[in-house]
A protein has these predicted regions:
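C-terminal helical subdomain
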Residues: 180, 201-233, 237, 244-246
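Substrate-binding pocket helix/loop in short-chain dehydrogenase/reductase
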Residues: 97-99, 103-108, 207
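Alpha-helical segment proximal to the catalytic Tyr-Lys
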Residues: 127, 169-173, 235
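Short C-terminal tail/terminal secondary-structure segment
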Residues: 96, 238-261
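Active-site helix of classical SDR
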Residues: 122, 156, 164
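Residue(s) in the substrate-gating loop at a strand-loop-helix junction
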Residues: 140
Length: 261
């Protein structure tokens, strides 16, 4: 029997990248999946799951508004009658350059999507989850170390890390676990411009060279960690952040820029 047979999962940000990889793998492991994204390509994710023999539905919604989140949780309950797994993955990169040029509106929007969105998902899902439920949020190595992302993005992902730790404590005694995965550099739609820029300059070989594995990650590798946390194999893992980053977070690989350079 598949590890997630009989379970129901919601995956946000499922139109592509890590979210799509997570939705596909959870379905492959036996879960019924509600794929959610504000991009219309989320329908393709559900169709791909169905074509592979899985059970899935798709909802196009803003994953960081109370109305949108309440609606897709209700949709999962209507479609499948239960809720066991939530992967709160939807996010944006915001301004990548670590500078003060990003305005307050853009900063707030990054926090809204990357931090308030997961909080809303947790709050809406918990009343429908029972003992053995698993919530996984997508954080980032940028939330663990400085220098791996822009100011707003890094702050939002640091917030996600504390969010899962605090919610794990808040849900003490319920049997619901809350954890996070912290990806390193992974080629997705969100990071595509970084990869394209490196390739256009003939520096493709430099991508991912700051971690000990000397390569970037694949969305499927992050999905494997999500599937583990969603399963009963992780039944004693709670309030934790699993870095899936090739070892980037084990050191400080960014050389400081000399003053005046």
């Amino acid at each position: 029997m598949s590890a997630l047979h009989g379970k129901v999962a919601i995956v946000t940000g499922a139109a592509g990248g890590i979210g799509r990889a997570s939705a596909l793998l959870l379905a492959e492991r036996g879960a019924a999946v509600l794929a959610v994204d504000r991009a219309p390509e989320v329908i393709d994710t559900a169709a791909l799951i169905a074509a592979r023999g899985g059970r899935a539905d798709a909802v196009q919604a803003d994953c960081a508004t109370e109305k949108g989140v309440t609606a897709f949780v209700a949709q999962a309950m209507r479609d499948f009658g239960q809720l066991d797994i939530v992967h709160a993955n939807a996010g944006i990169l915001g301004a990548f350059a670590p500078s003060f040029d990003e305005g307050p509106e853009a900063f707030a929007e990054t926090l809204r999507i990357n931090l308030i969105g997961p909080w809303l998902a947790i709050r809406a899902a918990v009343p429908h989850m029972g003992k053995g439920g698993s919530i996984i949020c997508t954080a980032s190595v940028a939330g663990m170390r400085a220098g791996a992302g822009g100011v707003a993005y890094s702050a939002s992902k640091a917030g996600v890390i504390n969010l899962v730790q605090t919610c794990a404590q808040l849900l003490s005694g319920t049997g619901i676990r809350v954890n996070a995965v912290a990806p390193g550099l992974v080629e997705t739609g969100m990071t595509q411009m970084l990869f394209d820029a490196a390739r256009s300059r003939g520096r493709e070989g430099k991508i991912g060279q700051l971690n000990p594995l000397r390569r970037s990650g694949e969305p499927s590798e992050i999905a494997e960690a999500v599937a583990f946390l969603a399963s009963d194999a992780a039944s004693y893992v709670n309030g934790q952040v699993i870095a899936v980053d090739g070892g980037l977070s084990t050191s400080h690989p960014f050389a400081p820029r000399p003053a005046g350079a």
